[in-house]
Amino acid sequence: MSEQDFREIARNGLWRNNPGLVQLLGLCPLLGTSNSTVNALGLGLATMLVLACSNAAVSLVRGAVSEAIRLPAFVMIIAALTTCIELLMQAWTYELYQVLGIFIPLITTNCVILGRAEAFAAKNGVLRASFDGLLMGLGFALVLLVLGGLRELLGQGTLLADMHLLFGPAAADWKIQPFPQYQGFLLAILPPGAFIMLGLLIALKNRIDESLAERAKVQAGDVPATQRQRVRVTGVIE
């Protein structure tokens, strides 16, 4: 596997084909658990681990599973790995496990995981499949983390609250409160606020992509000379 392959998989997972911002998969946990940083980070890490491990497992058994039972077999693999993560969370982060509730076992039905198993892991070697799962999971976790951080900050006026649920007593004083007198904005931590914030993040990503595409056209000389000066001044092609 070449360095170019690694870079391409990383770009797809983190930005170009991000599960949360581009594919719009896994929206149920993405919107349901992103009301705080600790919830978002906990579910994001769990999903990333299941995705990386399931991709590796599917790649290993892809030649031994017939076409007729491929999807049920993949679901069983994902369910087994999700159960392992669930048991680990019960043992080490039980309070966070209770907070996340049904969203941990629901990782089994996350479309991101089954989609990567079917579209990528079943057609590639273990190394490529594992790296794809890791980067896709990381991209999903980062969207969860950004969304959770923004919603917590706007809704409660804090950041990194209750991080001891994930990292233990040492993280009890990680809480940041930039605006001590802030009364909070209830909409931000409710489901409608999650939809609004996700929509704004998607719009921001699309705008960045458009700007990068316009700059690439200018650098490649595809923009007429009469427009180049305006692009340099405003950054926009009209």
UniProtKB/Swiss-Prot annotation:
NCBIfam families from the UniProt entry: PRK12405.1 (NF009070), rnfE (TIGR01948)
This protein's record includes keyword Translocase: yes
Organism for this UniProt entry: Pseudomonas aeruginosa (strain UCBPP-PA14)
Family assignment from sequence similarity: Belongs to the NqrDE/RnfAE family.
Principal location: membrane
Enzyme Commission designation: 7.-.-.-
InterPro entries per record: NqrDE/RnfAE, RnfE
Presence of keyword Cell inner membrane: yes
Quaternary organization: The complex is composed of six subunits: RnfA, RnfB, RnfC, RnfD, RnfE and RnfG.
Function statement: Part of a membrane-bound complex that couples electron transfer with translocation of ions across the membrane.
A GO-annotated cellular component: plasma membrane
Cellular location(s): Cell inner membrane
Positions of transmembrane segments: 41-61, 71-91, 95-115, 130-150, 184-204
Entry superkingdom: Bacteria
Mode of membrane association: Multi-pass membrane protein
Gene designation: rnfE
Name of the molecule in the record: Ion-translocating oxidoreductase complex subunit E
GO biological process: electron transport chain
Keyword set, alphabetical order: Cell inner membrane, Cell membrane, Electron transport, Membrane, Translocase, Transmembrane, Transmembrane helix, Transport
